[in-house]
């Protein structure tokens, strides 16, 4: 559990929420020489699908910095969701296909859509089904979700489907009526990346 220390000789180790995905953690290590905190991915923004990032006082903070450059100034999540929902309303004859990582990002997008009042079924690529079911088993409410496999092309008009990023540029997308492609990633702040992936709604 978060915050419960483990003693190893004269060293105390504890795990603390990283706010990245369900169960993600920073590791706090304390010994007579000081306190270190080591973390991989973490997120300070609010996320309805996981425990919030905890600021852990320390002498040394060891982190990665994927989005450390000034170009990465992320928009408010609610604004990005609003952009998606406005596009769905504007193009009811088209399917909206959102590329998102299967662990964490997909579930966050779903939860943010629900917070914005979107209560229609959301369709999932098969690769996302099990991990999303696990989130639900841990008490994360995500509303009505359906597998996209086997759904008729015409029935996907006006819907939102989440799929792994690799699927959005694959033959798999041919099952959708004139899809609008989006990608839920901070990398879309780099325009060349968005163009490279053929993203219509970055």
Language-model segments: which ranges?
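Short, surface-exposed amphipathic charged segments that create phosphate/polyanion-binding patches used
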Residues: 10-17, 135-141, 197
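Short, acidic/turn-prone active-site loops that include or flank metal/cofactor-
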Residues: 42-44, 66-68, 126-129, 185-189
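His/Asp/Glu-rich metal-coordinating catalytic cores
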Residues: 1-100, 104, 115-116
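A short acidic, often aromatic-flanked loop/helix-cap motif at beta-alpha or helix-coil junctions
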Residues: 3-8, 22, 129-131, 152-155, ...
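Short, charged, surface-exposed secondary-structure boundary motifs
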Residues: 47-49, 71-73, 130-138, 154-156, ...
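C-terminal regulatory/interaction regions
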Residues: 139-140, 147-202
């Amino acid at each position: 559990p978060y915050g419960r220390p483990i003693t190893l000789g004269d060293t105390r180790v504890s795990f603390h929420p990283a706010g990245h995905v369900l169960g993600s953690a920073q590791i706090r290590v304390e010994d007579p020489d000081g306190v270190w905190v080591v973390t991989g991915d973490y997120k300070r923004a609010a996320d309805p699908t996981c425990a919030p990032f905890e600021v852990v006082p320390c002498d040394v903070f060891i982190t990665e910095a994927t989005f450390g450059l000034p170009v990465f100034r992320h928009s408010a999540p609610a604004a990005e969701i609003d952009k998606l929902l406005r596009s769905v309303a504007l193009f009811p004859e088209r399917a909206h296909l959102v590329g998102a990582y299967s662990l964490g990002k997909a579930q966050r997008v779903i939860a943010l859509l629900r917070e914005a009042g979107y209560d229609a079924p959301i369709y999932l690529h098969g690769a996302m089904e099990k991990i999303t079911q696990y989130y639900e088993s841990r008490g994360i409410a995500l509303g009505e979700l359906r597998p996209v496999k086997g759904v008729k092309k015409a029935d996907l008009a006006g819907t939102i489907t989440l799929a792994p990023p690799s699927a959005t540029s694959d033959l798999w997308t041919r099952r959708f009526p004139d899809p609008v492609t989006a990608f839920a990633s901070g990398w879309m702040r780099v325009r060349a990346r968005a163009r490279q992936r053929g993203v219509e709604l970055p």
